[in-house]
Amino acid sequence: YAAMISYLDEIVGSLTQKLKEINQFENTIIMFTSDNGVTHLDQVDSGFFNSSAMFSDNVDMVKGSLFEGGIRVPSFVTWPRKIKEGSFSNHISSTQDFYATILDLFKIKKPNHITGLSFLPTLLGKKQNKHEYLYWETNSRQGQQALRMDKWKAIRRNIATGNKEIELFDLTLDTKEKNDVSKSNLDVISQIEIIFKEARTTPTLKNFYIKGLDF
């Protein structure tokens, strides 16, 4: 694992060096992100590297879960000609937005079936549209659904066992998702239940079916 990370670093370094040699680095956009949070399995010593940071005290909240520790990741973008060095944004985005952003970069109209939202305005320091909500699901850990809507984060776990309860967290006050406030926000839960049904479609591949939702 350490060798893969080191090799990636070396290759990206070689690429950026070559871009500088041919005077194209200033005109090149490079994006980095991750598909999930840190893992706690096998070769990764997440405790030693503190790679899970604030989520390190709970292995249920890292890779494989839809808690913040499993899905909240940083994104780094460099584009010297356009992006101010050292700039920072709290814009909430998703990997689905990368395709929409690239289309926007090339001024290509986004197809109607693409749900991603371009974050190019954020990169350029302009006014940015925001998602009404972001939705996730996975059949790991007995099936999970999650939703981010403004300050609210909702998660339903153990769907395959018949669980229908939705946990709700106010991320402005509770980033670690320790305090379930669903019982005191039933109106929000009702709205989320509707979105959980509207946002999903049956997966094309049966390998991604969730017991209790698809069979």
Language-model regions: role of each:
Residues 38-66, 83-87, 91-171, 205:
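C-terminal cap/loop subdomain of S1 sulfatases and analogous C-terminal strand-loop tails that border
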Residues 7-46:
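Metal-dependent active-site segment of extracytoplasmic phospho-/sulfohydrolases and closely related
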Residues 1-7:
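The substrate-binding groove and active-site-proximal loops of carbohydrate-active enzymes
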Residues 198-210:
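Bilobed periplasmic-binding protein-like "clamshell/Venus-flytrap" ligand-binding domains
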Residues 24-30, 72-73, 128-132, 149-152, ...:
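Loop/turn elements at helix/coil->beta-strand transitions in domains of secreted/extracellular proteins
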Residues 17, 21, 27, 43-44, ...:
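Secreted, luminal/periplasmic, and some membrane-associated catalytic domains
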Residues 174:
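Intrinsically disordered, low-complexity polar regions and short flexible loop motifs
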Residues 179-187:
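Active-site-proximal N-terminal segment of extracellular/periplasmic enzymes that hydrolyze or transfer
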